[in-house]
From Swiss-Prot:
Keywords: Repeat. Residues 394-417 have a biased composition (Basic and acidic residues). InterPro entries: RLR_Helicase. This is Uncharacterized protein YBL113C. Residues 118-393 have a biased composition (Low complexity). The lineage of its organism: Eukaryota, Fungi, Dikarya, Ascomycota, Saccharomycotina. Residues 113-417 are annotated as: Disordered. Disulfide bonds: none annotated. Coiled coil: none annotated.
Length: 792
């Protein structure tokens, strides 16, 4: 039975309370098989005990009670043993339970432990062994559970552990062995789970580990082996997951490793083997993923490596083999990706290499082989890419020694394009029709916020000004030689006549929306997670749209404060911020004092010809005379580029998560509306200076003003201090929202209004010096970071 047939064939399970649950065909077949086995067991042993005919329909304990005598720790058992032992423990619960079972041994043991809960439970099982053991542990929970199972062994063991949770669970299973073991571990969670499975072995093992999470899960599977092993490791996460699969082996192994994440995942697959192995490695991430695949083998292996990322991914594939191998390497990234492919072999291999990047990618391909190989090389990049091709082979082989900078050319691809010359092919036509229905407003000025369901008044303030293709990191939605609208080969283009907003544009806006919801570290990890879609904006939109409702709700929650300030114009008063009044003298200054300080800062910057963006980024007073003498925006930006401001910004801050031109292009046409508002306010600044009785000085022009706000945005130390002091605001991760927020007005301590950006400059100055009205700050620098760390 193929994958689609298995998806279509479903049954309904009537639960014990009369509820109905849709089950897959495999699970229905499993329950029926278990019913028949249970009936055979009941018939064979009727002279001894009457067992229920089904695990789902009745309380078997009550029905069998008249035939069986009860034991001290067991209920209606034949040839069963239930033991519970507690020795020298404090606040410890040890439980052993056996119900309606034959030839069952259930044991729970706790030794020399504090605040430990150890439980072993066996229910309606035959020839089942369930063990839970905890030894010399503190705050440790060890659980072993077996339910409605035949010939099942379930074990959970924790030894000399602290704050460790070890769980082994088997549910409605036949001939299944499920084991979870933790040895000499601290703050370690080890889990092994088997659900509705036949002839399945699931094991999770952690040995001499600290802060380690090891998980092995098997769900609704047949003849499946799932293993997760961690040995002598620190801060390691090892996971092996198999879901709704048949004859599938999923393995994740980590050995003698530090800060390593090793994951192997198989979902809705048949005859699939997925393996992820990391050996003697430090700071290594090794992942192998197979999704909705048949007869597919996906392997990711890292051996004796440092700071190495090895990934193998197969998605919705048939008869596909995807391999990524890294051996004896340092700072090496090896990736093999296969997406929506049939009979496709994708391999990436790196051997005894240093600082080497080897990638092999196959996307939406049939009968395609893509290989990238690097052997005994240093500083070498080897890439092989096949996209939306049939019977295509793309191969790059760098077999060199020494400081090689090879394979910088486009991959040589042998592609048979004849079958794709017809744009009206049925596949392309159906895909185009489906996308047009999903994004119906692309003939108008649609944006991703409309797609998510935001109202026009909300979109006005959440709008992604300045977000363009340069927002995307290099390599994300930026492939050349393909359709600019969908990034597909021209013969497979899914764009349609009259489309004003491209799918690629919606995709980069969707990426910006995801950035709205993530801090720097979370966004880095997200970019790694979507690596299979880096060359496929249409595929990414499909992935993004699945979480459409969730994303909408999350934005509404996280940005409620922002919309209240920018849309409903709720007033920010510094006196409402308790932390601000206690931790900063700026929050006790009058509006006049804040303005005086703002103009003084700019007067000093102009006099010293200090580079503005760098100063507000990290208080660095580098000189840049060309910036102050620039007559137009172009010359201004060229001056910044000449002194390396943009390069330093990318290397020091989260600006490195965008394309190299992103910040530079903010000085072009992106913020015309905000620029108009600022230039209209210049007259107000002159009147303010006259009213304050100070000598009028030239206020910063637009490009200098924008430099200030960009520097403040990427200044991590300043941002954290401001968000701590000003309690009405919270974290935000997009520059356009920061620019909008900076221009709202706030009430100073004397209830006079000042722009928020003036308050920002005052806080920034407070973090650096005591050069403020009324002398020295008396409480400043409560949060001051003398190291002034910037960015990520």
């Amino acid at each position: 039975m193929d994958l689609n047939q298995r998806k279509e064939k479903k049954g309904q399970h009537v639960g014990c309370c009369g509820s109905r649950t849709d089950l897959s065909a495999d699970t229905v077949e499993l329950i029926e098989r278990m019913d028949r086995l249970a009936e055979n067991q009941a018939t064979a042993s009727m002279s001894i005990v009457a067992l229920p005919s089904s695990f789902q329909e009745s309380n078997s304990s009550d029905r069998c009670r008249k035939y069986c005598s009860s034991d001290e720790d067991s209920d209606t058992c034949i040839h069963g043993s239930a033991n519970a032992s507690t020795n020298a423990t404090t606040n410890s619960s040890t439980n052993a339970t056996t119900t309606a079972s034959i030839n069952v041994r259930t044991s729970a043991t706790t030794t020399a432990s504090i605040n430990v809960r150890t439980s072993a439970t066996t229910t309606e099982s035959t020839n089942s062994n369930t063990n839970a053991t905890t030894t010399e542990s503190t705050n440790s929970s060890t659980n072993a559970t077996t339910t409605a199972s035949i010939n099942v062994r379930t074990s959970a063991t924790t030894t000399e552990s602290t704050n460790s949770s070890t769980n082994a669970t088997t549910t409605a299973s036949i001939n299944v062995r499920t084991s979870a073991t933790t040895t000499e571990s601290t703050n370690s969670s080890t889990n092994a789970t088997t659900t509705a499975s036949i002839n399945v072995r699931t094991s999770a093992t952690t040995t001499e580990s600290t802060n380690s999470n090891t998980n092995a899960s098997t769900n609704a599977t047949t003849n499946s082996s799932t293993n997760a092993t961690t040995t002598a490791s620190t801060n390691v996460r090892t996971s092996a997951t198999t879901n709704a699969t048949t004859n599938s082996s999923t393995n994740a192994t980590t050995t003698a490793s530090t800060n390593v994440r090793t994951s192997a995942t198989t979902t809705a697959s048949t005859n699939v083997r997925t393996s992820a192995t990391t050996t003697a490695s430090i700071n290594v991430r090794t992942s192998a993923t197979t999704t909705e695949s048949i007869n597919s083998s996906t392997n990711a292996t890292t051996t004796e490596s440092t700071n190495s990322n090895t990934s193998a991914t197969t998605t919705e594939s048939t008869d596909s083999n995807t391999n990524a191998t890294t051996t004896a390497s340092i700072n090496v990234r090896t990736s093999a990706t296969t997406t929506e492919s049939t009979n496709s072999n994708t391999s990436a291999t790196t051997t005894e290499s240093t600082d080497s990047n080897t990638s092999a990618t196959t996307t939406a391909s049939t009968n395609s082989s893509t290989n990238a190989t690097t052997t005994a090389s240093t500083n070498s990049s080897t890439n092989a890419t096949t996209t939306e091709s049939t019977n295509a082979s793309a191969k790059e082989d760098a077999n060199k020694d020494g400081n090689a900078e090879d394979n910088r050319f486009h991959p040589v691809t042998d592609i048979n394009k004849e079958s794709y010359k017809r744009k009206g092919s049925q596949m392309v036509f159906l895909e185009r029709k489906k996308l047009k229905a999903q994004f119906p407003n692309t003939s108008e000025n649609m944006n991703v916020l409309q797609f998510l369901g935001f109202r026009s008044d909300e979109i006005k303030h959440l709008f992604l000004y300045g977000i363009d293709i340069y927002f995307c990191p290099e390599g994300v939605f930026t492939q050349y030689g393909l359709c600019k609208g969908c990034q597909k080969m021209f013969g497979l283009c899914v764009c349609w006549a009259g489309q004003k907003v491209s799918y690629r544009r919606i995709a980069w806006e969707a990426l910006a929306v995801e950035r709205m919801l993530r801090n720097d570290e979370e966004y880095k990890e997200y970019l790694e997670d979507i690596e299979p879609y880096h060359g496929d904006p249409v595929g990414y939109l499909k992935y993004f749209s699945v979480k459409r409702r969730e994303i909408y709700s999350q934005i509404q929650r996280n940005y409620a404060w922002y919309l209240a300030i920018t849309r409903r114009r709720e007033t920010i008063s510094v006196l409402d911020s308790t932390r601000g009044k206690q931790g900063s003298q700026v929050f006790r200054m009058s509006g006049r004092q804040i303005k005086e300080l703002y103009y003084k800062v700019w007067s000093n910057l102009r006099e010293s010809k200090t580079e503005v963006l760098q100063y507000f980024l990290n208080w660095d007073e580098k000189k840049c005379r060309e910036e102050w003498e620039a007559k137009d925006d172009t010359v201004f930006v060229e001056a910044l580029e000449k002194v390396g401001v943009f390069q330093r910004l990318r290397s020091m801050t989260s600006a490195g998560l965008q394309g190299p031109q992103y910040v530079k292009l903010q000085f072009s046409r992106h913020h015309r509306q905000l620029r108009s508002r600022y230039e209209l306010s210049l007259g107000m600044h002159l009147r303010d200076q006259l009213a304050l009785g100070v000598t009028p000085s030239k206020v910063p022009h637009w490009t200098a003003f924008l430099s200030m706000l960009i520097g403040l945005f990427y200044n991590k130390t300043f941002r954290q201090k401001l968000e701590y002091l000003l309690e009405q605001i919270s974290e935000m991760w997009l520059l356009p929202h920061w620019l909008d927020l900076a221009n709202v007005e706030v009430l100073a301590a004397d209830n006079t209004r000042v722009p928020l950006y003036m308050l920002m400059v005052a806080v920034h100055k407070e973090l650096d010096s005591d050069d403020v009205p009324d002398g020295r700050f008396d409480i400043i620098l409560l949060c001051r970071d003398s190291s002034r760390e910037v960015g990520e």
